[in-house]
Each structure stands twice: as C-alpha cells, then as structure tokens.
Amino acid sequence: MTDAAVSFAKDFLAGGVAAAISKTAVAPIERVKLLLQVQHASKQITADKQYKGIIDCVVRIPKEQGVLSFWRGNLANVIRYFPTQALNFAFKDKYKQIFLGGVDKRTQFWRYFAGNLASGGAAGATSLCFVYPLDFARTRLAADVGKAGAEREFRGLGDCLVKIYKSDGIRGLYQGFNVSVQGIIIYRAAYFGIYDTAKGMLPDPKNTHIFISWMIAQSVTAVAGLTSYPFDTVRRRMMMQSGRKGTDIMYTGTLDCWRKIARDEGAKAFFKGAWSNVLRGMGGAFVLVLYDEIKKFT
C-alpha cells in the first residue's frame, strides 16, 4: 500500500472507532431528542400521549417501553455512524488538501478559515450520500414507541429497510435528503471548520492539553448543533412520511414542512429536543478529541 492509502485507512479506522464508542454512550439522550422532534409526525403517539419535555420523556420511556428501549435504533446508529464519521474524517483531510493547499494560516487567516469551512461541509455532504438509508432507518426505529410484537412498527433494521423499500422504493429511503444536505453542510462546516481553525491557532496544536481540546470541541459542537437544528427537525419530520399513503401524508414537501411547523407549532418547535442535543454534543466533542488522541498512536 502507498503512504497515502495507509494514511487514509488510519483516518478511516481512528474516526470510526471513536465514533462507535461515543454514540453508544449517548444513545439514550439521542433517542429522547428524536422522540421530541418527531412525535407530532408520529402515527403511534396521539396528541394526549405526547411527551412534555426531556424529563417527561426520560421518566416515561422505561415505564412504557422498558429500560433497554433507550437503545432502540442504536445498532443502526452504530452501523451508520462508523462509516459516516470515518468517511467524514477521511474525506475532510482529502478536501483540506484541495481547499488549503499552499495556504499559510498565519498570513492568510480568512482564506484558511474559508478553506476549513469548505472542506468540512464537503466531507459531510459526501459521506451522507453513502449512508442516508441507515440514518433514515435509525430515525424510524428510534421513533417506534410500540412495546413489543404487534405494537412495534418495525421488528428491526432489516425489517424497516425492506418495508419502506417495498412501500415507497428507493425514494422512500432518501426522504428528506435535500434538506439533510443543507443542514449537514452547515453543521459540518462549523464542526470541522471552526475546530480546525481554533486548533490551528494554538501555539503547539499537537501537544495541546486534552482538556483544552475538549473545551474547544464542546463549544464547537454546541454552536454547530444549534445552528443546524431546524434543518435536522425538518428532515426527521420528512423521514416520518415514508410508508404513508393518502390522508396520512402530513407534508407535501420540504417547504410545506417548514411552513406547517412554523404555522401550527410555532418557531420554537424547530428546536424541540435541542437541549438534549447539546448534551448529546458532548459525545460529538469527545469524538473529535478521541480521534486526535488515537491518531497520535497510528
């Protein structure tokens, strides 16, 4: 293997392992966030049974569905997240070579900053093309509030993918893809762009204390998550459309979804579950720091 191929493989492995560990740890927070986001678009959750907030959700889930249901959809998330994060990190470095080749970060700060934004956004959008059906399945499995057996909408990852494909074809598995690309570019641009720029401004980036790296990463993930959160809410709502027919269809398209959420639920509805997303972002920050630490040993 060439040095470039070895470097790419190391990036892929380091990013994937770091992501799998952190996502499993924050899976319960992830499910709470998803339920708060999509409950208005769920056929299983009637108006009188909707969750009032994070605490209500955390208390009711184990009572109604069992403690293990906090990890519902986690297998799909880990399977999805391994290639997603690994591809993000691997492509990020490749795109950095394209956008930042020959750029001096000390004398060309804004060009350096813009290059980091572009490489981060392009990496996120590229990887999304490959793993979107898994992200879709993870959302639908996490939104499934049935206790067991016949009450469940899907029996598992494979059952979810097969049922939606039979019902809506490949288009059903990519429902909400367009708004996802918009959101992912905004999120990844901040996630990678600001983080790399901040790290690059430190006197000795490779020997920065892990706590400083974590603080930078934590701030970046919180800002990036809140900035792109409305896009995430809309894409999750659109994902809930797949498999529906006739009058069960709530939104005719992405723009209609934006309009109806704003009109019927108010602007704050775009940010439902956002606080749990900030907590979940601690896992994202941990991924960035862990990735840098793993790379030191590869």
Swiss-Prot record:
| UniProt free text on domains | The transmembrane helices are not perpendicular to the plane of the membrane, but cross the membrane at an angle. Odd-numbered transmembrane helices exhibit a sharp kink, due to the presence of a conserved proline residue.
Residues in compartment: Mitochondrial matrix:
38-74, 131-178, 232-273
User: What function does this protein fulfil?
Assistant: ADP:ATP antiporter that mediates import of ADP into the mitochondrial matrix for ATP synthesis, and export of ATP out to fuel the cell. Cycles between the cytoplasmic-open state (c-state) and the matrix-open state (m-state): operates by the alternating access mechanism with a single substrate-binding site intermittently exposed to either the cytosolic (c-state) or matrix (m-state) side of the inner mitochondrial membrane. In addition to its ADP:ATP antiporter activity, also involved in mitochondrial uncoupling and mitochondrial permeability transition pore (mPTP) activity.
Chain positions found as N6,N6-dimethyllysine? 52
Coiled-coil residues: none
Q: Where is this motif: Nucleotide carrier signature motif?
A: 235-240
Q: Which residues carry this modification: N6-methyllysine?
A: 52, 147
Q: Report the family membership.
A: Belongs to the mitochondrial carrier (TC 2.A.29) family.
Intervals holding Solcar repeats: 6-98, 111-201, 212-297
Q: Which Pfam families match?
A: Mito_carr
- Give the organism, scientific name: Bos taurus
Which residue positions does N-acetylthreonine occur at? 2
Tell me the subunit arrangement. Monomer. Component of the MMXD complex, which includes CIAO1, ERCC2, CIAO2B, MMS19 and SLC25A5/ANT2. Interacts with AK4. Interacts with TIMM44; leading to inhibit the presequence translocase TIMM23, thereby promoting stabilization of PINK1.
Q: Which reaction does it catalyse?
A: ADP(in) + ATP(out) = ADP(out) + ATP(in); H(+)(in) = H(+)(out)
The protein here is known as: ADP/ATP translocase 2
Show which residues sit on the Mitochondrial intermembrane side of the membrane.
1-7, 100-109, 200-210, 292-298
